[in-house]
Amino acid sequence: MTKTEHRCGWVALLGPPNAGKSTLLNSALGHKVAIVTPRAQTTRNQIVGILSEPDAQVIFMDTPGIHQQRGRMNKILLQTAWQSMHSADVILVMLDADLYIKKPDFLENDVKPLMDAVAAEERPVIVAVNKVDLFRDKSKMLPLFIELQKLWPKAEVFPVSALKRDGLPELVKLVKSKLPVAPALYPEDQLSTLPVRFMAAEIVREKLFLALRQELPYSVAVEIEKWDEEEGRDLVTIHAVIYVGRPSHKSMVIGKAGATIKDIGTKARVDIQDLLEKKVHLELWVKVREGWTEDVGFLRSLGLADE
């Protein structure tokens, strides 16, 4: 790459659920633009994160995890991931190295369908094998690397720890080298294309999953109903509604004497204040909306389905 060449392009982050795509995006940017929880399928929308460096601008598209689950919403999430792949200049596949050891059918059931689809695309493919920091004996990963290279010889396989940033600078350098020569598309100080209202709703959803872990069913959504910024005042008033699928889920989110939702609101408010760099007054309500994951009109209102 010469000094006069500036590269810019779109990079689709694809992979099974919980592979570490959102963690890698946040680590690469040095800022949090995608929520991260231990729950599979935390990411529902295409999350765009922009890394601007003197020689390149990398526009990452974090996507929902590739999975085999049924249902209208899951179908929409898969469409989002595939659309990102089709529009990308570079495809970056994230795999969880730990699952190769723990799940005997990992390659056949989780990886092969994804990589076969990716291989049909005529663009550079990089496979980032994530969570290598979990292996004291790195030789245990060698069979995975050999199998991946044998099955998809055109893909470049790269070890990385998104959480600890091991190998991340080298991975970013490799990604940049695959981008087309082009000027930057966004200002160098812009980190994302996401509206702040969307990011605030995502923060609330993250705190929900972190507070309730596996207890809370997947059918939960957050919608911002009110957003007021008074001119001349360093204060934003936000009213957010948490939608759940059943009355029992509502009780779970509220908690005993409202303790759970109060804790969720407090933690979300802190992060939203950091995002907006303003004081925030956040109020949360919980509403039951049965069958919302199959309601296309409601999914559209949440930005999860095309008009």
UniProtKB/Swiss-Prot annotation:
GTP binds at residues 15-22, 62-66, 130-133. CDD domains: Era, KH-II_Era. Keywords: Cell inner membrane, Cell membrane, Cytoplasm, GTP-binding, Membrane, Nucleotide-binding, Ribosome biogenesis, RNA-binding, rRNA-binding. Residues 62-65 are annotated as: G3. GO terms for biological process: ribosomal small subunit assembly. This is GTPase Era. It is found in: Cytoplasm; Cell inner membrane. Pfam families: KH_2, MMR_HSR1. Residues 130-133 are annotated as: G4. The lineage of its organism: Bacteria, Pseudomonadati, Thermodesulfobacteriota, Desulfovibrionia, Desulfovibrionales. Residues 212-290 form the KH type-2 domain. GO terms for molecular function: GTP binding; GTPase activity; ribosomal small subunit binding; small ribosomal subunit rRNA binding. It comes from Nitratidesulfovibrio vulgaris (strain DSM 19637 / Miyazaki F) (Desulfovibrio vulgaris). Residues 160-162 are annotated as: G5. It comes from the Bacteria.
